Amino acid sequence: MTLLFADLCAIFTPYRWMIEHVTTKRGQLRIYLGAAPGVGKTYAMLGEAHRRLERGTDVVAAVVETHGRNKTAKLLEGIEMIPPRYVEYRGARFPELDVEAVLRRHPQVVLVDELAHTNTPGSKNPKRWQDVQEILDAGITVISTVNIQHLEGLNDVVEQITGIEQKEKIPDEIVRAADQVELVDITPEALRRRLAHGNVYAAERVDAALSNYFRTGNLTALREIALLWLADQVDAALEKYRADKKITATWEARERVVVAVTGGPESETLVRRASRIASKSSAELMVVHVIRGDGLAGVSAPQLGRVRELATSLGATMHTVVGDDVPTALLDFAREMNATQLVVGTSRRSRWARLFDEGIGARTVQESGGIDVHMVTHPAASRASGWSRVSPRERHIASWLAALVVPSVICAITVAWLDRFMGIGGESALFFIGVLIVALLGGVAPAALSALLSGMLLNYFLTEPRYTWTIAEPDAAVTEFVLLAMAVAVAVLVDGAASRTREARRASQEAELLALFAGSVLRGADLATLLQRVRETYSQRAVTMLRVRQGASTGETVACVGTNPCRDVDSADTAIEVGDDEFWMLMAGRKLAARDRRVLTAVATQAAGLVKQRELAEEAGQAEAIARADELRRSLLSAVSHDLRTPLAAAKVAVSSLRTEDVAFSPEDTAELLATIEESIDQLTALVANLLDSSRLAAGVIRPQLRRAYLEEAVQRALVSIGKGATGFYRSGIDRVKVDVGDAVAMADAGLLERVLANLIDNALRYAPDCVVRVNAGRVRERVLINVIDEGPGVPRGTEEQLFAPFQRPGDHDNTTGVGLGMSVARGFVEAMGGTISATDTPGGGLTVVIDLAAPEDRP
């Protein structure tokens, strides 16, 4: 059949692509991951393309960003290129991936660089990775590149390290779902040398890059993040492989130490001992507490809380699992975590005690298989009764055996030794005690059997005439009847008390579990973390949160953890319905008992609440953004209306005066009116410039080019821009500015720095009339501080930060001093250059604005 189908494909050449497209599977995604730009991701991608071309694979390039690197561009030779599709936006044309052209060409492999790229507005999809999904669905293999800083889950960490917010992001799930992720890694020193030689950026950008993003510390931290992230993905892939192949044996690919604790006084000793064992082999440490599903062997929450705090302080993770058989639950958890070592505590027990009960530690060692077990003794180790360590099934069998054995033993002892000393009343009391023992062990049914057997043995062996079923004395008959009745009645009472005790303990354990899950939510755990905690606690293969919207035929997977998760209710081994039938918690693994479902129903409700809380937070965020935008619009209209009317009115009056024929103006008056017109136009120009800058900052399109900027030149250009064309007050105001910056140099964008200084000096001249405005600068270690100092009225203490908010003016009494955007624009420009700006009081009165920028690594 396969050969025939291939022959048909060869014959019908015009339809060959259609046949392959219909019958092919989804394409594979291969990603080259790097810690920073310039490590060689694109170079490695092109090298892989040439290797595949040599093997006869049909490879084309759709998007390859060479960034002007000659070696990279040379590797493009010999690879077919698919022309980009151009998208027009704001009067410019931008090249983007042409998905339709790729689908029409339908190669075996396509190269698409920079997977996290944001498409130009007007494209079919907002993000390039969404374009790639369409190509993969068509059965085409895609090779792409990603930098670690673009992963959504690591974005905040990278921003904290580098001080730069990454605008282009890609969901972690997209990269995790790739068929292959290969790390392209070089040392920070090698990358900096490559950068210095001009192999990454153009020569004019090298100094700025080396002193900012490409600092050795930044690169080292980014490299560590990339290595750890990839190690976690390799670990997850290994776990999935072991689950798919049903491998339960321990693979010592990575050292992991699991320590079992009860919450007793010995637990802290066990955790510290396990921490020392883990530190010697640089192993991961996990602390596990087993909760008995039957409610036995409980522990107080404060004791367990102290153990949790200790585990956290030692860098360990705390886990809780549910199981009736403690050794089995421990070993199942250890095998699931692929642990190599298990630490358990044991009490010092006598030889007789070990003879009748081998204990949890001994059973754990016997069943551990390839896991190394460390037995740690401690004087305060808890000694649970042997009966509490017996599984429910074993207790059930033992109670029925006791119903047969206990009366028989009592009868034998009584006949052999006690008969000649006791009467029928004392002998009946012995059997009565035996029935109580059986009731405590197994409940009403075994106790009833024990009472019946006790009556029969008492009648046959100890009642006259003996060894017959006949009862000669009426008193004996009454005694036996009363024995049976009282034994059964007391057994019912004892069983009820024992049941209530077990229910109370079980309720306590359920409360402990609910507190555990609720604590995770209160500590800010997301939905995936909560589901992972449920999966570990109940030893499930996978847990899925499913949402079935009203009227929908299929459910929507909100979140899932584990391997091979369920995607619908019918395929789940355990399905927990939440309230209104909208949410379901689906579990794949062992089927859970009814007592576990009670807790899980509450947990599933918490999970559904997290989903709804997240949605409400998003809606609230959108509403807040709309409200802020509306408030900003009203503030803008209120502030700008005056600043537009005032210069326009002044210019109109001046022009009207000059055009009148009734008055003959002197040359001096004419010059003054023309100066008024010029000053009004300058005010309007400055207002429009600030509005445009504010909108550019809000849109996030400011891309500063950081290089060595000499502050003396920047200040002089700022003064020129302020005084250009100015007359009267502004002309005299420029003369009040005293500059003392020496030969200070900062890493900055010269144009942006000029605008910042111009806004700050202009602001000082406005609000400190007739006062000297001083501008000085100096280097402090790796930073350059620029001070703009005035001796005017200053601002009220505690309101300094308000200066940098849009449409805020010192005092904010009227609109005669400007729209209030200058300081806001200055802060936006400074932060875009990686610096900070702040305001403080000038000693003796006034305001000092401090700009903090990076200094070049090498002094000039």
Swiss-Prot record:
Keywords: ATP-binding, Cell membrane, Kinase, Membrane, Nucleotide-binding, Phosphoprotein, Transferase, Transmembrane, Transmembrane helix, Two-component regulatory system. In the central section; belongs to the universal stress protein A family. This is Sensor protein KdpD. The lineage of its organism: Bacteria, Bacillati, Actinomycetota, Actinomycetes, Mycobacteriales. It is a multi-pass membrane protein. The modification Phosphohistidine is found at H642. One of its GO terms (cellular component) is plasma membrane. Autophosphorylated. It is an enzyme of class 2 (transferase).
